[in-house]
Amino acid sequence: MRSNILKLLQRTSRRYVSSKDFEPVIGSNPKKQTSRLMVGSVGVMIPVLLYLFYKNDSKHSEIKKIYQNEKKI
């Protein structure tokens, strides 16, 4: 991080400072950013879908009923 700032200052000291010099380096490539968003959304959706399928599964509801009946006794 510090070396990036030093390089930036060395680069900008020779000429007029423009707003492009202070743009973030990470995420500047739109294709990379889109692929990261896709991977992130898939990484979040898979566990959520697995949880929903498990929760709505008939075996899970039977186990839940048995557990609730035992809890009442």
Curated annotation (Swiss-Prot):
Entry's Gene Ontology cellular component terms: endoplasmic reticulum; membrane
Spans traversing the lipid bilayer: 37-54
Predominant cellular place of this UniProt entry's protein: endoplasmic reticulum
Topological category with respect to the lipid bilayer: Single-pass membrane protein
The entry's keywords: Endoplasmic reticulum, Membrane, Transmembrane, Transmembrane helix
Subcellular localization: Endoplasmic reticulum; Membrane
UniProt xrefs under Pfam families: YKL065W-A
Keyword ATP-binding included in the entry's annotation: no
Highest taxon above the source species: Eukaryota
Name this protein carries in UniProt: Uncharacterized protein YKL065W-A
Source organism: Saccharomyces cerevisiae (strain ATCC 204508 / S288c)
